[in-house]
A protein has these predicted regions:
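Conserved HGGG/HGGXW glycine-rich cap/lid loop of the alpha/beta-hydrolase fold
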Residues: 1-40
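Active-site loop/oxyanion-hole signature of alpha/beta-hydrolase fold enzymes
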Residues: 29-63, 77-79, 100-109
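Short beta-to-alpha linker loops that shape the active-site pocket of alpha/beta-hydrolase fold enzymes
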Residues: 34-38, 92, 208
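Gly/Ala-rich beta-loop-alpha elbow adjacent to hydrolase catalytic centers
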Residues: 65-70, 74
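Flexible "cap/lid" loop of the alpha/beta hydrolase fold
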Residues: 79-129, 156-159, 186, 191
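Conserved alpha/beta-hydrolase catalytic His-Asp/Glu region
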Residues: 121-168
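Conserved serine/cysteine hydrolase catalytic core
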Residues: 154-217, 221
Length: 231
């Protein structure tokens, strides 16, 4: 089994390190990559190109996992590579014909913007260290939370401003994992995305927005169980 791990906004491939150790200890292969967070012109299509260039050409045993903003990218990857499955982890789900900003404006599910209060003249955004610790990493150890917060980058938002390049949903099976104490992406949105957009019941885990750091073993077990269920 080969898990291709697609990080969310502000993060990088580093955020998956603990989860990769757990997945590989269970006999799986993993791939992670850095997406061009700081490129103002990079949208979901560009992100998908980066993912596709990093993953195996034969995707028949690949599951692509997209965290948070990475959820806007993984259906595009699936449309090209036809992996075994895709997993949205506390993820945004695109709607063909709309931008995610349009989705946000249309929702009445309690969604509030998860963007940080610090904006920059170039249109990017960034998180103050303490705010990131409280929002993304509140259930991690203080050492892990602070180290992660210090590695966050600026983020540009072309991927949410643009109309998604996804034209329609394909046949690749999807799963959705939400975290019940998520402070970055409201649980109401996650349930709406899973049930109303994907037509599936979400898998619910305890904890905050970053289970790959706070509960990597549990997350690895859940990802493995989804794979078994799809076989």
């Amino acid at each position: 089994m080969h898990f291709v791990l697609v990080h969310g906004a502000y993060h990088g491939a580093w955020c998956w390190d603990a989860l990769r150790q757990e997945l590989e200890a269970a006999g799986n292969q993993t791939t992670a990559m850095d997406l061009p967070n700081e490129d103002p012109e990079a949208g979901a299509g560009r992100y998908a190109e980066v993912v596709l260039s990093a993953m195996p050409r034969d995707a028949s045993n690949v599951v692509v996992v997209g965290h948070s903003l990475g959820g806007l990218t993984i259906p595009l990857v699936a449309a090209t590579a036809m992996p075994l499955g895709i997993v949205f982890l506390c993820g945004l789900v695109p709607v063909p014909g709309k931008s995610f900003d349009d989705q946000h404006n249309d929702l009445d599910s309690g969604f509030t913007s998860s963007r940080p209060p610090v904006g920059h003249p170039d249109g990017s955004a960034s998180w103050p260290e303490e705010g990131a610790m409280e929002t993304f990493f509140q259930d991690c150890s203080p050492e892990v939370a602070r180290a992660a917060a210090r590695r966050l980058t600026r983020q540009h938002w072309q991927a949410t401003h643009e109309v998604t390049p996804l034209r329609s949903w394909g046949a690749v099976p999807a799963a959705y994992i939400l975290c019940t104490d998520d402070r970055a992406l409201p649980v109401a949105y996650c349930r709406h995305a899973a049930r109303d957009l994907l037509g599936i019941e979400p898998i619910e885990l305890p904890g905050g927005h970053s289970p790959f750091l706070s509960r990597p073993r549990l997350l690895a077990e859940v990802l493995g169980s989804i794979y078994v269920a799809q076989q």
